[in-house]
Amino acid sequence: MEEITFAADPMRLMIAAAVGIIVLLVLIIKFKLHPVLSMMISAIIIGAGAGMPLTMISDTVEKGVGKTLQGIALLVGLGSMFGGILEVSGGAQRIAETLIDKFGQKKAGWALGLTGLVIGTTVFFEAGVVVLIPLAFSVAKQTKKSTLYYAIPLLSGLASGYAFVPPSAGSVLVANALGVNLGTMIMVGIPTALICMLVSGIIWGGFIGNKIFTELPANVGEIKDDGKELPSFGLVLGVILIPLVLILLSTLSKYMPLPAGVQDVLGFLGKPFLALTIATLAAMYFLGIRRGFSGAQLKKILDHSLRPVGMILLVIASGGVIRWMLQDSGLGNIIGPALEKSGLPLILIAFFIAILVRASVGSSIVAMTMASGIMATMPAVMDTSMLYRAAMCCAICGGATALSHVNDAGFWLVGTFLEIDEKTTLKSWTIMETLIGVTALIVSLVISIFA
């Protein structure tokens, strides 16, 4: 069956797209309508406004959902299960405690930042905060320093790991939309995340922690050792590295003088879904069964870890519908040449789209979905090298992280846990998130020079 082609009047299409995006923002910001419904309404407005046949609009909606989820649904689910076991087993706590021991109190910010970065690649940001923030409070209590001095590096690491390094949902989503294999995304994402954590966590955390003294939360005295024996550091780190190593080996094996059979095996084992399946099974055995968890307990942990996944996938799918509606209506072929003539780097355009949506809507996932979807409709983007598109992924993820303020749930989560007012949260957390975005943009532009 031949795919329906459609050519809209350029002016009509531009107006329809503008109206659709404005309606999307108004529905979310003004009327507080759920992003999933808002994006579906916006997509239909764009298609109908552009004059697309009704049958084509419905076909595009179905195609948008299918094509968007086919490369990411399983990865997000597996990654969530993997992170759930890591969290409940005490693996995240072990990483933090060991690094704090090695670095010492004077460099505890580094230890917490690196812990956040490692854990942020595998667990949702909110879960990472709940599990690890007591450790930041513990160090602050011992040193009598501002809680911001230790909390900001930890939060920066969590945010950077989640934004840039697979198998986190955000990085996988953007890489999938722009056709970047996860091995390349990992190789670009890790140094980007490290630099962002250094600038926004260590440097900014030290500055703001010395400038603003924040007391320990009132209930910090209630945080006690629950007596649970934690898994060893080497075991936890080894399990965390399984998916990263397998995916990287798959990518690098193509450039190694290896027998064809070995390359095929490495390529197969490094398929993201299989690498994460192996990692999840390893986590279940080494961090679960061998440490006394029953099958029923593990099932309960996995079920609980999957609760947030459905909503995230619905948001991603709805954003994918807008992306395909824009693509099938021909918008990419219109704005692509216009943007090329503007002389602006494509990476800069991608960053600005992401940061505008993030500041307007508040959701980083919506911003990532929208920005990557819009950029993917432009033929000029898909003609660039894999490395360039990986750098663009980091710019998008950075833009979608920046400018967290009162319309972002993360803003209130951090303020509540640290027991600080909105003004202090803006001065510390919001600037930290924005520094992550700006630093990621600079790193992405530098990488693009060599792409």
Where are these regions (language model features)?
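Membrane-interfacial loop-to-helix junctions in multi-pass transporters
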Residues: 11-15, 54, 66-72, 99-114, ...
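Core transmembrane alpha-helical segments of multi-pass membrane transporters/permeases
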Residues: 37-40, 44, 60-93, 268-330
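Long, contiguous bundles of hydrophobic transmembrane helices that form the permeation core
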Residues: 2-11, 187-300
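Hydrophobic transmembrane alpha-helices that form the pore/transport pathway of multi-pass ion
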Residues: 100-188, 360-398
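Juxtamembrane and boundary regions of transmembrane helices in multi-pass small-molecule transporters
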Residues: 145, 180-228, 398-451
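Hydrophobic core segments of alpha-helical transmembrane domains in multi-pass membrane transport
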Residues: 16-28, 40-49, 76-81, 116-120, ...
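Short helix-coil transition sites and intra-membrane helix breaks within transmembrane domains
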Residues: 30-35, 69-73, 83-93, 119-133, ...
